Amino acid sequence: MKLFRSNVGPFDLEVAITGVKMGDQLLQLGCGNGKLFAVLASKVGLTGHALGIDDKLAACERTKAAAEKAGVFAEVGHGNYAALNSNDSLFDLTVIHHIIGNMKPEQRVACLQETYRVLKPGGRCLIIEPALRSGLGALFRPSAIDPTYLTSGAEQGLKAEGFRAVRRLAEQDGAAFIEGVRPPD
């Protein structure tokens, strides 16, 4: 009798927490190596749409390659997080992946305002960011996150931009998952 699952994928936690499903309109800001985006994009299927945006060209190329390797139909673009080239109320889910804490305060505000604008009423914004270290971990590996962000954090930023039902969903494997919902009109 097997007590534990041994076939857990590298992004199963992220996929489960996002709740992304077939037919969703997905936006990911900050694609990094593109592997998380490729996995999330595979979940929306042909009836949904996945768009990944990164402000670094190299990250866009890595994300395109990861999506192609995974065999998913997805769109990847190079752009400014504070000026998204998308229609209002288009996305069901926005994932902000490991970028918001490294932005300057004015960029962070503009990014969250744009995220709010492009989300459908009732749409969800999920911020995935490094969990803050404490104890010896904080001494030996200090955070590169903006100190002004550390005092308020993602929860306060989401609330300030009008998101509701803001909550910290989990802290696991060095990552924190914070969710906010755009209220229905």
Segment roles from a protein language model:
Residues 25-27, 32-83:
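Class I SAM-dependent methyltransferase SAM/SAH-binding core
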Residues 109-121:
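A short glycine-rich, Lys/Arg-flanked "PGG" loop and its adjoining helix->strand segment in the class I
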Residues 5-24, 39:
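Conserved alpha-helix/loop element of class I SAM-dependent methyltransferases that forms part
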Residues 93-107:
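A short SAM/SAH-binding and catalytic strip from SAM-dependent methyltransferases
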Residues 4, 123-179:
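C-terminal alpha-helical "lid/dimerization" subdomain adjacent to the S-adenosyl-L-methionine
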Residues 45, 103-105, 119-121:
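Helix-to-beta-strand junctions that scaffold the AdoMet/dcAdoMet cofactor pocket
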Residues 82-94:
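A short acidic, Gly/Pro-enriched loop at the edge of an enzyme's catalytic core
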